[in-house]
């Protein structure tokens, strides 16, 4: 999945739809939150795949390199 720019861009710009970090882009989720999902299991479906991808991005320290792909939302969504 890391080699498909469209999948990567969609995952980076996907907004978390529920929970403590609802409304935050997946790329801006805290790493401990993604580690928790990794240990408990990612949700089924596309969101789970996107969370797993963002987990791998953060695990490998690539989030700064991918920051230019984040589409502006009109407000600062980095809490």
Q: Model regions: which residues?
A:
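DEDD superfamily 3′-5′ metal-dependent exonuclease/proofreading module
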Residues: 1-79
